[in-house]
C-alpha cells in the first residue's frame, strides 16, 4: 500500500504534447536518466504553456492566460545539488539556499521497482493545487494549498532541477526552481496574451518565444563597471533597480497608475528621470551590511531618503530581489492609496497597517539619485535603496501635478514617450 507524505509551507511574507527530446542533457548524476529528466521538464513546460494560453482548468472555469511566461530549462548543477540532499529520502525540505523546493515522500512495503509512476503522480499532485483550490482574479499567491503549484507556475522562473531517490520502502521526489512563487500577496504570473514573438517577452533581455512560452537568452557574465569601487553589487542589479524605478515614475507621470482611493493617480508635470549614483549606493551598502532590518539613522545618510526590504529566502537572486522590492514598495499606491490631492499628510502616514512611505519616496518628483544594495544575511536577504535628494516631507505634494513634462526645469530635456524630465 502506498502512503504519500506531502510537505508544504506557507510563508507570511499525464504527460502530453511532449517537446522534442534532447540529444542528451549532459548531466553527470547517475541517479536519474535522461528519460526521467525529459519527463520532469515536459510536465512543467506543458503545464506552464496551458496556463499561458488560457486553457488550464481552475476550480471554476479557466485560469487567467499569462504574458511573459517563461519556458524552463534543465540545470544539471541544481539537479546534482538536490540529488545529494535527498540521499536519505527525507520528507522535509533540504534547506538549499536561493531556490524554491517542492518535495514528496512515498512509502510502500513492496518498494518502488518503477518510480516513474509515482513521479508522474507527484507532479500531478503538486500541479493540482489550482484546480482544487482556485486562484484569485489577480493571480496572487495567498497560501490556500497553492505552495507547490506556485513554484511550478511562477512566470519568471527559468531553471529547474529535479531528482528522486529510493531507500528500500521509501521514495523521495523533489524539484528545485530558480524562482520563488510563494511570496504572499504577489502575483504568480501577469494576466495577458501568450507570446507570439520574442518582442512580446520583456522580463529578460534578448528573449525569444516558442509556442506561447518565452525563452530566456544565455546568461551573461556579471560585471561591476558602473561602480567598481563598490563590492557586492553588479551592473545588472543596478540596471534592474533603476529601470524599474523609472518605469514606475513614467507610468505615474502619464496618469496610468491606479490609486486605491479612487481612479488613477494624477499626472506629473516635472517628474525627474532617475540616475544611478555610486556614492548613494555606497551608503546603501554600508547599511545593508549591518544585516539589521531597520532604517538607518538620518545622520548616517544626510540628505537621503531610504526604503528597505527583506525576504526569508536565503541568497535570493539579486535581480529578482531588486524587482520584487521595487514592486512591493510601489504597490502601496494601488493597495492603500494617496488620493487626488497628492499630498503626504500625517493622516495618510499614520494609517494602521497601510504604509505609504515607500511609494511616496519612489514617486517624489525632486528625487533623482538612486543607489541600492542587496545583501545576503544569515537569516534573510536584505534590500536597501537610498534616494537623493530625499523626499517624504509632511504637508508637501508628492509631485507637481500637470501634463507630463509641462514644467521641466529650464535647460532640461523631456523624454516624451516616458513623460520624464532629464535630471540636473
UniProtKB/Swiss-Prot annotation:
SMART domains documented for this protein: SCP
Keyword Signal among UniProt keywords: yes
CDD domains attached to this UniProt entry: CAP_euk (cd05380)
GO cellular component: extracellular region
InterPro entries from the UniProt entry: Allrgn_V5/Tpx1_CS, CAP_dom, CAP_sf, CRISP-related, V5_allergen-like
Chief site of localization: secreted
Disulfide topology: none
Start and end residues of each SCP domain: 41-177, 242-387
Subcellular location: Secreted
Signal peptide: 1-18
This protein's UniProt keywords: Secreted, Signal
Function in brief: Associated with the transition to parasitism by infective hookworm larvae.
Annotated family: Belongs to the CRISP family.
Name assigned to this protein: Ancylostoma secreted protein
Amino acid at each position: 500500500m502506498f502512503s504519500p507524505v506531502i510537505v508544504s509551507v506557507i510563508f507570511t511574507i499525464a504527460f502530453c504534447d511532449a517537446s522534442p527530446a534532447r540529444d542528451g542533457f549532459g548531466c553527470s548524476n547517475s541517479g536519474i536518466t535522461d528519460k526521467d529528466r525529459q519527463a520532469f521538464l515536459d510536465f512543467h513546460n506543458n503545464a506552464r504553456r496551458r496556463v499561458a494560453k488560457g486553457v488550464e482548468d481552475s476550480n471554476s472555469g479557466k485560469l487567467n492566460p499569462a504574458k511573459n511566461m517563461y519556458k524552463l530549462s534543465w540545470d544539471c548543477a541544481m539537479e546534482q545539488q538536490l540529488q545529494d540532499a535527498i540521499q536519505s529520502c527525507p520528507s522535509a525540505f533540504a534547506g538549499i539556499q536561493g531556490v524554491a523546493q517542492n518535495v514528496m515522500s512515498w512509502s510502500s512495503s513492496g518498494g518502488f521497482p518503477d518510480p516513474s509512476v509515482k513521479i508522474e503522480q507527484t507532479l500531478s499532485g503538486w500541479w493540482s493545487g489550482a484546480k482544487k483550490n482556485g486562484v484569485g482574479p489577480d493571480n496572487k499567491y495567498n497560501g490556500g494549498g497553492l505552495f507547490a503549484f506556485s513554484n511550478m507556475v511562477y512566470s519568471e522562473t527559468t531553471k529547474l532541477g529535479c531528482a528522486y531517490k529510493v531507500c528500500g520502502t521509501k521514495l523521495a521526489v523533489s524539484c528545485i526552481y530558480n524562482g520563488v512563487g510563494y511570496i504572499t500577496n504577489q502575483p504568480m504570473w501577469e494576466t495577458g496574451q501568450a507570446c507570439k514573438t520574442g518582442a512580446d517577452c520583456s522580463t529578460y533581455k534578448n528573449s525569444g518565444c516558442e509556442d506561447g512560452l518565452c525563452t530566456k537568452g544565455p546568461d551573461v557574465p556579471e560585471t561591476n563597471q558602473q561602480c567598481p569601487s563598490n563590492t557586492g553589487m553588479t551592473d545588472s542589479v543596478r540596471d534592474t533597480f533603476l529601470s524599474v524605478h523609472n518605469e514606475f515614475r513614467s507610468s505615474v507621470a502619464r496618469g496610468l497608475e491606479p490609486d486605491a482611493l479612487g481612479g488613477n493617480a494624477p499626472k506629473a508635470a516635472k517628474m525627474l528621470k532617475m540616475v544611478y549614483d555610486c556614492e548613494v549606493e555606497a551608503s546603501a551598502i554600508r547599511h545593508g551590511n549591518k544585516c539589521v532590518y531597520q532604517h538607518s539613522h538620518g545622520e548616517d545618510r544626510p540628505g537621503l531618503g531610504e526604503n528597505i526590504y527583506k525576504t526569508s529566502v536565503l541568497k535570493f537572486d539579486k535581480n529578482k530581489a531588486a524587482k520584487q522590492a521595487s514592486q512591493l514598495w510601489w504597490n502601496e499606491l494601488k493597495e492603500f492609496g494617496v488620493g487626488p490631492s497628492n499630498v503626504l499628510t500625517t493622516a495618510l502616514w499614520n494609517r494602521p497597517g497601510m504604509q505609504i512611505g515607500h511609494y511616496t519616496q519612489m514617486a517624489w518628483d525632486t528625487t533623482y539619485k538612486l543607489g541600492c544594495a542587496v545583501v545576503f544575511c544569515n537569516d534573510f536577504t536584505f534590500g536597501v535603496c537610498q534616494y537623493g535628494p530625499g523626499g517624504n516631507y509632511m504637508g508637501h505634494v508628492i509631485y507637481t501635478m500637470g501634463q507630463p513634462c509641462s514644467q521641466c526645469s529650464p535647460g532640461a530635456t523631456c523624454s516624451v514617450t516616458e513623460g520624464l524630465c532629464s535630471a540636473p
